[in-house]
């Protein structure tokens, strides 16, 4: 289950606090990036940004040479980084680009080389950018 998330909370003169979140991971392969347009009356936002966690190693079974298969449990992946900013100044009508980082890939259980079992991928970056292009 993916738990990466980005959450905005907006407030400003005459604007009742609202929040919006994005949980589907973005990456260059699926080209799934988000945009958010600052509503009228909003002059500041709070953002909680969580990066994708690292992948874990898989459980593996192997023959240790004694004709008995050994099973080793997998290990959990690393946690994604988190940052929180309570007051980002924005301009009504401004567009923010958003990327929700993907979780890392798991280690390779199909390899006979034990070091590949733990060779899991790192998690993706999550970010917020003003205008410009994604990536």
Describe each PLM feature range.
Residues 1-46:
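Enriched but not universal
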Residues 23, 28-35, 39, 49-132:
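Glycine-rich strand-loop-strand elements at beta-sheet edges
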């Amino acid at each position: 289950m993916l738990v990466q998330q980005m959450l905005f909370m907006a407030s400003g003169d005459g604007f009742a606090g609202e929040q919006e979140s994005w949980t589907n991971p973005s990456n260059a392969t699926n080209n799934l990036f988000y945009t958010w347009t600052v509503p009228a009356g909003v002059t500041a936002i709070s953002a909680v940004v969580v990066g994708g966690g690292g992948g874990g190693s898989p459980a593996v079974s192997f023959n240790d040479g004694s004709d008995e298969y050994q099973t080793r449990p997998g290990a959990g992946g690393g946690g994604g980084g988190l940052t929180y900013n309570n007051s980002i100044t924005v301009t009504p009508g401004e567009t923010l680009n958003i990327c929700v980082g993907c979780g890392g890939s798991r280690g390779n259980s199909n390899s006979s080389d034990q070091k590949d079992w733990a060779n899991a991928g790192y998690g993706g970056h999550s970010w917020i950018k003003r205008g410009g292009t994604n990536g």
